Amino acid sequence: MPAIGIDLGTTYSCVGVYQHGKVEIIANDQGNRTTPSYVAFTDSERLIGDPAKNQVAMNPRNTVFDAKRLIGRKYDDPKIAEDMKHWPFKVVSDGGKPKIGVEYKGESKRFAPEEISSMVLTKMKETAEAYLGESITDAVITVPAYFNDSQRQATKDAGHIAGLNVLRIINEPTAAALAYGLDKNLKGERNVLIFDLGGGTFDVSILTIDEGSLFEVRSTAGDTHLGGEDFDNRLVTHLAEEFKRKYKKDLRSNPRALRRLRTAAERAKRTLSSSTEATIEIDALFEGQDFYTKVSRARFEELCADLFRNTLQPVEKALNDAKMDKGQIHDIVLVGGSTRIPKVQSLLQEFFHGKNLNLSINPDEAVAYGAAVQAAILSGDQSGKIQDVLLVDVAPLSLGIETAGGVMTKLIERNCRIPCKQTKTFSTYSDNQPGVSIQVYEGERAMTKDNNALGTFDLSGIPPAPRGVPQIEVTFDLDANGILNVSAKEMSTGKAKNITIKNDKGRLSQAEIDRMVNEAEKYADEDEKHRQRITSRNALESYVFNVKQSVEQAPAGKLDEADKNSVLDKCNETIRWLDSNTTAEKEEFDHKMEELTRHCSPIMTKMHQQGAGAAGGPGANCGQQAGGFGGYSGPTVEEVD
């Protein structure tokens, strides 16, 4: 059973598998190699991926996207407050954690970001299973290099809810470097800078790749809240203000109008990567008012100028941390859809004094490609060029504990190789202190109040002694997923305590995960029932219209009038029933099918026997579903702006 690699993106996700010595990026059921990270809830079903994004203008409040911008964060995070201005769906606080509120099948539901991400992961898993023809459980999932401990844990939980055994959480730029290194057959030692600007996150990593097989991350930097969506937001704000100026109407109060404007803005942004001007035309955008306008590339660049410039700060930081200067970088590799923006490319090129950028790998697929390679390695694949690959990654943030006066004492410095283990000895702060509280933080600031709290535990039972005498050994053990275990031991008694940092404030409990796993299975069953219902309905519709057409077009004398009327009456009665029972259950459609077949089959057989020898009419074979007549064998598709 192969293991798959999943790039779980903010706006789009992608899945790949390594087999027969190469990576296959797997297309979904719509034939697309990337799948929108969208989940929609309607009064009858749940949609994931392309179908969800396609109906977003009709159902903006119940179509959820950007779960990656919520995952592992607290509700009061200022970044979430900023995003909520742009989201049409509702985000509420549930014990300090963000939850997404939607209407599903007439009921109000609340979903954790992990659940929404797990639904996208389930879709990617099903895409791979359909292609490979077998069930899949093992996967490598990628995260931005700058994701913190709680965001990594939450992503792992999402995989678990989706029924995946997460072999490893790996960093997106590292995965992209793997794709680049293996694809290009690099010789010698090369310093490679990966510039990864996606839909919602931004990472820079510098790696040394030796002979295309040893991948050593030297440093990493980034912004987990910068990407294509932020550029869309600037354009949407600009267009909404232009609409207000022209027509004295503010469309921002209307979620549907705002969504149609966002879709048009996203399309214009893409156009501006290859043209210097984009035209926006939206009919009846708000209160019947059409909206036609043009946006030039120069105007778009001006709107996003500060955001584009902000991409260079992490590049400088990564270079400083790797102790390299610009001239030591051999290759600059662009990853992520937003690196197609010409201004982003030209700023980066100027920063590196005109050095050519490497555009040779597919920016949308490189991360999934690398994840698929890592999945194959971790599941023991020894084939071809991956057998010698060794990947050495680093910790994105410093980790430490709070000591007297709220000082952050670091045990693991950022950019240290992982897995890694560090031990330091501490002591008590006051005489006869019976216990110590170990408070764990991550971040770069000198005081813990400015850093991110990960968790706390108490070590009690310290024998009475003057301050500074007891020896308490604290060990930080950072595993290959970038997830932290902390232990503390009092040396005189040998008393020890340890925790895996689970960031209990922001993280799901085991009970919640178990509940979500069960719910995910229930939703999958409901989706399957819905699919079966639609199939049965389509079969009945197809059969009834075929029979009706056959009878109506039967040559004179082939069928007596009484039989003809009997069949037509039964068909029309069934069509009326279909129209008034659109939400009937599968069993009801099957029952109607049986009833109709029983009634029509003998008459149709008689008609065919009478016509035997002559050229047969349009044959609706008795009692069988006639394939794909008209548009009735599948769902009807409507285009939405």
Swiss-Prot record:
Changing residue 241 to D: In strain: Z(H)1. Induction: Heat shock induces the synthesis of seven proteins at five otherwise inactive sites in the polytene chromosomes of fruit fly larvae. Two separate sites, producing two and three copies, respectively, code for the 70 kDa protein. Expression is induced by proteotoxic stress caused by toxic protein aggregation, for example by overexpressed Atx-1/ataxin-1. One of its GO terms (molecular function) is ATP binding. PROSITE patterns: HSP70_1, HSP70_2, HSP70_3. Residues 609-641 are annotated as: Disordered. Changing residue 187 to N: In strain: IS2, IS3, IS4, IS5, IS25 and QD18. It comes from the Eukaryota. Forms a complex with Hsp83/Hsp90 and Dpit47. This is Major heat shock 70 kDa protein Bb. It comes from Drosophila melanogaster (Fruit fly). The gene is Hsp70Bb.
